[in-house]
Amino acid sequence: GVRIFENTPVLDVAPDGDGMLTTCASANIRSDKILMATNAFRGLLPQIRRQVIPVWDYQIATEPLTPEQLDSINWGKNRHALSNEAYMFHYYRMTKDNRITWGGGGAVCYYYGSRTDQGVADDRGRFERLSKEFFETFPQLQGVRFSHRWSGIIASSTRFRMVPGIAFAGRVS
């Protein structure tokens, strides 16, 4: 089984016999392996600091789709989140009220040295590019309007995908 420790600031990780010891402010956790889910600006391990960068990412959400529109994309029966590697990567999911949230793609912006620029938060051109990529994936939804848009800094691997087993002989990912 797996145990998840949310909102647990980690002070240190170190090998401990055949496993790992995670030192936290209020407790120590022993485990076989560690999966670290961290923010873009965290970097406890040098191996992870070199693999994770902050990128400015953009998302849009459609207006609620009709049953006919859902049938046209054959996505109305399940609500699985999806991703693809077109234009670097996209990720998208269906919401409870039948909207598609769509993010990523060529609209991702990185500044060398982990710097950021608040001036790109509401870049109209990046949102337009994201909507163009949406309709290239879902041409049958041409004409659907976007009701929401937002952006923010997220953590991404330098390869734009999960990087497993990067420290302590594969015991930390």
Regions from the language model: what does each represent?
Residues 1-12:
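A conserved beta-strand/loop element that lines the FAD pocket in flavoprotein oxidoreductases
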